[in-house]
Amino acid sequence: AYWKSFFVPGYAHVANRMKKHCKVITLIHNAIPHEPRFFDKPLASLLFKQCHGFIVMSDNVRYDLRKLYPGAKYIQNPHPLYNHFGSKINKNEACRKLGIHPSKKNLLFFGLIRDYKGLDLLIEAMGQLNEDYHLIIAGECYGSFEKYQTLIDASPAKKRIFVHCEYISDEEIPIYFSAADALVLPYRSATQSGVVSVAYNYDLPMLSTPVGDFKNSIEKPGTGIVVPEISATALAQGIEELFTPSQQATIPANISKEKAALSWETLTRKLLDFINSGFI
């Protein structure tokens, strides 16, 4: 699996040695990193030329791959469901463990905290929402959390924002996703997101900005809302809409339908057909 150029020297060496004996297929999460540097594209091209084929999981990554390596042979398949973290637990119990109130509308920001993920926008949006809305921030910070803490301290919603700025173990994941009522992805840029696949496993509605593959993975199947622009106001308005009766009435069934489509078996069949097709 490839997502950053740091891996290229090792991956390219292995691929170059292995391609004489077997087909080399690379799963690409990001062909170009979210925070690119001048050497990312040439290094990615170096690796891709050593491979027979590729798996991509979004239109954005497919586009980047074809720009970097026009002759690439690939299949495209959505990110399958992450269902290995354990089952959903009782919401009251999950909230008790996190010290939050189960009767509130609990929003979850989950995963590694990086600038491009727009947590600052979500913190600002919380100040525009009423006291029914609480925010859980769960994940390690890539760098200092100080700038986010400053925003939280200055926010009228500071008592409704609960910070768990730390590594979240696999065993803890069911607690956070079971306590939440919605996952929020306020990203400034994206391709696809593994967190979306986790949210599906826990039947969690989602709200995102209009970046990456979120229109295909959230808006198109009707499992949440993609707001029209990247701003705190758009996030706040979208969050309020997500909790309207009309949205709450339709989203659960749409999530169930999408979960059935996001199987690892589907990806396996596509991959085997790709290998056996003679195209690579």
Report each predicted region and the residues it spans.
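Donor nucleotide-sugar binding/catalytic pocket of nucleotide-sugar-dependent glycosyltransferases
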Residues: 49-88
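A short helix/loop element that forms part of the nucleotide-sugar donor recognition site in Leloir-type
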Residues: 86-100
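A short, well-ordered alpha-helix in the C-terminal region of glycosyltransferases
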Residues: 96, 157, 247-261
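Conserved donor-binding/catalytic core segment of Leloir-type glycosyltransferases
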Residues: 101-117, 123-127, 136
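Glycosyltransferase donor-sugar binding loop
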Residues: 110, 134-149, 166
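Nucleotide-activated donor-binding/catalytic signature segment of Leloir-type glycosyltransferases, i.e.
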Residues: 148-174
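Acidic donor-binding loop of glycosyltransferase active sites
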Residues: 175-192, 204
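Conserved acidic donor-binding segment of nucleotide-sugar-dependent glycosyltransferases
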Residues: 220-221, 225-232, 239-246
